[in-house]
Amino acid sequence: MASPRLENFRRIVVKVGSSLLVDSEAGEVRASWLAALAADIARLHGRGCELLVVSSGSIALGRSRLKLPRGPLKLEESQAAAAVGQIALARIWSEVLGDHGIGAGQILVTLQDTEERRRYLNARSTIAKLLDWRAVPVINENDTVATAEIRYGDNDRLAARVATMASADLLVLLSDIDGLYTAPPAQDPNARLIPVVESITADIEAMAGSAASEFSRGGMRTKIEAAKIATTGGTHMLIASGKIEHPLAAIANGGRCTWFLTPANPVTARKRWIAGSLEPKGTLTIDAGAVTALRAGKSLLPAGVIRVDGQFARGDAVVVRGPDTHEIGRGLVAYDADDAERIKGRSSPDVAVILGISGRAEMIHRDDLVIGPAGAMG
């Protein structure tokens, strides 16, 4: 199968490892390389692409700023180094993107933020708003609070979770290697680069090495795990070398890399997950006008809800039924059961008054809603 073209993707997550961002000898940012990457991002941004960056480097920068000795760090030392490094990392990205007139917004997340549905929706909403404003979200694992038991591993899997959370079309993992090989190339001179992976089989997993460095906690194995997460969520993924300047431009020009392809798209995969994998915690009954609106692809507004049943939290799955009690669809609700009861049947301006905050307009956003064909559900 032919490789896709980079410029054909609408929303792209770019993951930058600490071994690329930080010079391991000097402990400082590789400024010229980062400026070249920022120029690549700006070029895609100027073409209308939406870009997100998942950036490692806070611990590496922190240990440099604090002049810590080389060698492994204890957990509390890593957390303290990250606290210093996060400030430097945010400033660096703000400056290099700002040189191109692009705003940057820092988001620090943990494993729970992408696995617990309420926090997942909060992070997703923040990312969506930054993209609406044409800013670039710069995301990092919150190393100051993450522990060994709740880590990802060099942000590869975090990047994959972010990509699926943001419904990205493509995840680019920039690495110190230009893709997946049939064997570790440093050990086997006959190792071949695999340009396209259509399915992650046991053989593909066996090809993953375990190389890592003091500055980078991950290896090829975590990249394969990331590919599983991304492709299951409907996001294509590629691994490419970030050791060259302008790495995204190199990919766009047909440079060496490995593509992991998925037959799904992010919206389809997400809606399949909502419809088939989540246990509903409650029910929203809606009026006939809302049924018509949902079948036309609209979001569910509080004004169309006539009854709320069950005890659910924000982000839980609920069943949506029409006035005849037949199931219309399922979705992730944006309010908990108590607030949903208070605002049912009310207009958007009323919702802000009732709740005392300017909340979300939708009871269920259309991206979080799966509607079945007329008469097919319930």
From Swiss-Prot:
The biological pathway it contributes to is: Amino-acid biosynthesis; L-proline biosynthesis; L-glutamate 5-semialdehyde from L-glutamate: step 1/2
EC numbers, comma separated = 2.7.2.11
Q: What stretch or stretches form a coiled coil here?
A: none
Q: Which reaction does it catalyse?
A: L-glutamate + ATP = L-glutamyl 5-phosphate + ADP
Q: Which domain of life is it from?
A: Bacteria
GO terms of biological process kind: L-proline biosynthetic process
Name the predominant localization. Answer: cytoplasm
Which InterPro entries does the protein's record reference? AceGlu_kinase-like_sf, Asp/Glu/Uridylate_kinase, G5K_ProB, Glu/AcGlu_kinase, Glu_5kinase, Glu_5kinase/COase_Synthase, Glutamate_5-kinase_CS, PUA
Keyword vocabulary terms for this entry: Amino-acid biosynthesis, ATP-binding, Cytoplasm, Kinase, Nucleotide-binding, Proline biosynthesis, Transferase
Residues at which substrate binds: S56, D143, N155
What Gene Ontology molecular-function terms does this entry list? Answer: ATP binding; glutamate 5-kinase activity; RNA binding
Its localization reads: Cytoplasm
Domain PUA intervals: 281-358
One short Pfam name that applies is PUA
Residues where ATP binds: K15, S175, D176
Provide the Gene Ontology terms for cellular component: cytosol
User: What is the role of this chain?
Assistant: Catalyzes the transfer of a phosphate group to glutamate to form L-glutamate 5-phosphate.
Family membership, please give it. Answer: Belongs to the glutamate 5-kinase family.
Protein name (record): Glutamate 5-kinase
